[in-house]
Curated annotation (Swiss-Prot):
Taxonomic lineage: Eukaryota, Sar, Stramenopiles, Ochrophyta, Bacillariophyta
Compartment(s) where it occurs, according to its Swiss-Prot or TrEMBL record: Plastid, Chloroplast thylakoid membrane
Function: May play a role in photosystem I and II biogenesis.
Chain segments annotated as transmembrane: 4-24
Main location: plastid
Protein name from the UniProt record: Protein PsbN
An example Gene Ontology CC term for this record: chloroplast thylakoid membrane
Membrane topology designation: Single-pass membrane protein
Family according to the record: Belongs to the PsbN family.
Organism (species): Thalassiosira pseudonana
């Protein structure tokens, strides 16, 4: 394989991994521990 192909595959898989981790953090079991500043603020 060419070097450019390997770099593109690596960068693409890195971006997909970061996206999957952020979705898991936002909606997974750990999301119960996240605080919501809009719910804490009362008018």
């Amino acid at each position: 394989m060419e070097t450019a192909t390997i770099i593109v595959i690596f960068v693409s898989s890195l971006l997909v991994g970061i996206t999957a981790y952020s979705v898991y953090t936002a909606f997974g079991p750990a999301s119960k521990n996240l605080r919501d500043p809009f719910e804490e603020h009362e008018d």
